[in-house]
Amino acid sequence: MHNQAPIQRRKSTRIYVGNVPIGDGAPIAVQSMTNTRTTDVEATVNQIKALERVGADIVRVSVPTMDAAEAFKLIKQRVNVPLVADIHFDYRIALKVAEYGVDCLRINPGNIGNEERIRMVVDCARDKNIPIRIGVNAGSLEKDLQEKYGEPTPQALLESAMRHVDHLDRLNFDQFKVSVKASDVFLAVESYRLLAKQIDQPLHLGITEAGGARSGAVKSAIGLGLLLSEGIGDTLRVSLAADPVEEIKVGFDILKSLRIRSRGINFIACPTCSRQEFDVIGTVNALEQRLEDIITPMDVSIIGCVVNGPGEALVSTLGVTGGNKKSGLYEDGVRKDRLDNNDMIDQLEARIRAKASQLDEARRIDVQQVEK
């Protein structure tokens, strides 16, 4: 029930990664990267499908060898989500995965080879209508830039990025996006700010090597949140030393928190105190797990008492306000019913699923009317 965030998106050009539009006002795409051995086709396919189930728009796969390229061919045949091939050092691998239908090439022109090899990759990408991501990383800056700046700085990352952008410009290739990642939040944020002023290509956001599930999510939320709130960013990845599925969940949580893009349920829950009339924490944890399959955007508030419960319920799709033995249920800001505190989880799950179905049907009818 909350309005969309008043964020003015940075204007950028439009590219497509598979069937996913990137830039020029398109929804911010959420992506992750597999951490299986690419040559283990079964494990990689299973992980990609798990990422698809939680909403991944794009998945990146490392392709370090020709054997991995042959495995990529088989993987591509078995999944639906667009795949980005992560290529370093050997330009021939990029040419090979292009034959196999890759949706995007992630390369670093600085380590892919000489001018002729870069031209061959770009010509192949142009012929097959494959976009490229230029991936600059503070941990792998060119040696001359390391010597010039002494350490990674925003100016160093910008210079590296512009060097590669200019290279593609000279080759008359404009179907690309750019990232300037760093593990330090301030370094990454300032680098992206500088880059956003220099080019109009789409930007892929990320705080690289952010850390484990908890600390990495915090760093990413701060860094990506700052940039997104300024309208910067067209795709994003939350980099975690954790299950890649968690990267997608955190990515959508960041977008939901900024009211930029919603997928699934946005739970609003109190941290609990002695006033709670039912087990709020247990209820929220159980519902988050049970309702992962719901993709309908909804705000659901679960508050343990009447101090803040009614106020949150007024601006929620569904809201529960704790009461003695029974708690008030609100729908679209109107009190509708009372739920037994001892059976809260099952009752609330049923109500949420019913509301999601109702909203989906209403949207389907709206779409049909527009199409008429």
From Swiss-Prot:
Required co-factor(s) are: [4Fe-4S] cluster
Keyword Transmembrane helix assigned: no
Q: Respond yes or no to whether keyword 4Fe-4S is given for this record.
A: yes
Q: Which GO terms describe its molecular function?
A: 4 iron, 4 sulfur cluster binding; 4-hydroxy-3-methylbut-2-en-1-yl diphosphate synthase activity (ferredoxin); 4-hydroxy-3-methylbut-2-enyl-diphosphate synthase activity (flavodoxin); iron ion binding
Pfam families registered for this protein in UniProt? GcpE (PF04551)
The pathway where this protein functions is: Isoprenoid biosynthesis; isopentenyl diphosphate biosynthesis via DXP pathway; isopentenyl diphosphate from 1-deoxy-D-xylulose 5-phosphate: step 5/6
Q: Which organism is it from?
A: Shigella sonnei (strain Ss046)
Gene this chain is encoded by: ispG
Please describe what this protein does: Converts 2C-methyl-D-erythritol 2,4-cyclodiphosphate (ME-2,4cPP) into 1-hydroxy-2-methyl-2-(E)-butenyl 4-diphosphate.
Q: Which GO terms describe its biological process?
A: isopentenyl diphosphate biosynthetic process, methylerythritol 4-phosphate pathway; terpenoid biosynthetic process
Q: How is the cofactor bound?
A: Binds 1 [4Fe-4S] cluster.
> What does the record give as the reaction this protein catalyses?
(2E)-4-hydroxy-3-methylbut-2-enyl diphosphate + oxidized [flavodoxin] + H2O + 2 H(+) = 2-C-methyl-D-erythritol 2,4-cyclic diphosphate + reduced [flavodoxin]
Q: Which InterPro entries match?
A: Dihydropteroate_synth-like_sf, IspG_bac, IspG_bac-typ, NO2/SO3_Rdtase_4Fe4S_sf
The beginning of the lineage is:
Bacteria, Pseudomonadati, Pseudomonadota, Gammaproteobacteria, Enterobacterales
Official protein name in the record:
4-hydroxy-3-methylbut-2-en-1-yl diphosphate synthase (flavodoxin)
Quick one: which residues bind [4Fe-4S] cluster?
A: 270, 273, 305, 312
Q: What is its EC number?
A: 1.17.7.3
